[in-house]
Amino acid sequence: MIGKEVTLQDIVLELTEPQTVDLHCEEELPEQDTEVEPERRAYKIILCCGGGCGTRLRLFVAATQFGIRGLQDLLLEEVVILCPDCRNSDLQHGGQ
């Protein structure tokens, strides 16, 4: 711009053809590997009834290494397994 007022000669337009991008190109995406499921192993858990009667209980599970450690933590701290006799005497039906 030369001077205080804008004139049409001061504006330079570069009119070029925009480059188009072929969105339907023939490029193929590689097949994604299917997520490998962690290996589950069978475990036999022998524990005493948590109701106090001392009955030995057997529990069979299939779990990952992480899962069996989590179950171990739950059984040692938060959850107890009951035998059928103790279950009948102390059963809560979800607040009923």
Swiss-Prot record:
The keyword Magnesium does not apply. It comes from the Viruses. Residues 1-37 are annotated as: E7 terminal domain. A zinc finger (unnamed) spans 49-86. One of its GO terms (biological process) is DNA-templated transcription. It is found in: Host cytoplasm; Host nucleus. GO terms for molecular function: DNA binding; DNA-binding transcription factor activity; protein domain specific binding; zinc ion binding. A motif (LXCXE motif) lies at residues 23-27. Highly phosphorylated. GO terms for cellular component: host cell cytoplasm; host cell nucleus. The E7 terminal domain is an intrinsically disordered domain, whose flexibility and conformational transitions confer target adaptability to the oncoprotein. It allows adaptation to a variety of protein targets and exposes the PEST degradation sequence that regulates its turnover in the cell. HAMAP family: PPV_E7 (MF_04004). Plays a role in viral genome replication by driving entry of quiescent cells into the cell cycle. Stimulation of progression from G1 to S phase allows the virus to efficiently use the cellular DNA replicating machinery to achieve viral genome replication. E7 protein has both transforming and trans-activating activities. Induces the disassembly of the E2F1 transcription factor from RB1, with subsequent transcriptional activation of E2F1-regulated S-phase genes. Interferes with host histone deacetylation mediated by HDAC1 and HDAC2, leading to transcription activation. Belongs to the papillomaviridae E7 protein family. This is Protein E7. The lineage of its organism: Viruses, Monodnaviria, Shotokuvirae, Cossaviricota, Papovaviricetes. The gene is E7.
